[in-house]
Regions:
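Short, Lys/Arg-rich N-terminal segment immediately upstream of the first membrane anchor
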Residues: 1-9
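Extracytoplasmic low-complexity, Pro/Thr/Ser/Ala/Gly-rich segments
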Residues: 27-96
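Structural motif
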Residues: 124-132
Length: 177
């Protein structure tokens, strides 16, 4: 039979563990929410004509934002977060039924593809090679590719290139956090 001191110690240990888990969860979700809010705000900027992207770099995450300045809303079409857990995509405008999420770090992601990514008139497929290469292609042929073998696209950037429907590389505006 446990003593009163042992029982009290166990209860305190469980309570401290719960409080720590809650604090860590709130910190992580708050960090993601703050980044999303900032990038959503930045996504309303007017950029040069063409389907371009913006990179936002944080201490633990990188956000890549796809734009279509010819869209009536002049807003972002889609967004991809790259962090230690992999890739997370989300439509910035709530009217877009768009989003995808890959668990596991990108270099170790299982080979294969995920279909059914849609942004109103846009739809796409995401591919993983299993060797660190991730590629997202929209229905018109445009998209992005992350490949550790690619040279850095910009100072502080990732090994990522953005391409148009004709395969040509697209410019990328860089916005540091």
């Amino acid at each position: 039979m446990r003593s009163k001191a042992e029982t009290t110690a166990r209860i305190l240990t469980v309570m401290i563990g719960c409080v720590l888990a809650l604090a860590i969860g709130m910190w992580v979700s708050g960090d993601v929410g703050a980044m999303r809010d900032k990038v959503e705000k930045d996504a309303r900027r007017v950029l040069p004509d063409g389907f371009v992207c913006q990179s936002s770099e944080g201490s633990r995450m990188k956000a890549l934002v796809f734009y279509d300045p010819n869209d009536p809303d002049n807003g972002a079409k889609a967004m991809v977060y790259v962090d230690r857990t992999g890739l997370y995509g989300d439509g910035l405008d709530r009217k877009f039924a768009f989003g995808w999420f890959f668990r596991g770090s990108t270099p170790n992601a299982a080979p294969g593809k995920v279909e059914g990514l849609t942004v109103e008139g846009y739809s796409g497929v995401a591919y993983f090679s299993g060797t660190g290469v991730a590629r997202i292609e929209m229905a018109d042929g445009s998209g992005m590719e992350h490949d550790p073998a690619l040279p850095l696209a910009w100072v502080g950037g990732e090994n990522t290139r953005f391409f148009g429907a004709d395969g040509s590389e697209l410019p990328c505006a860089v916005h540091p956090f």
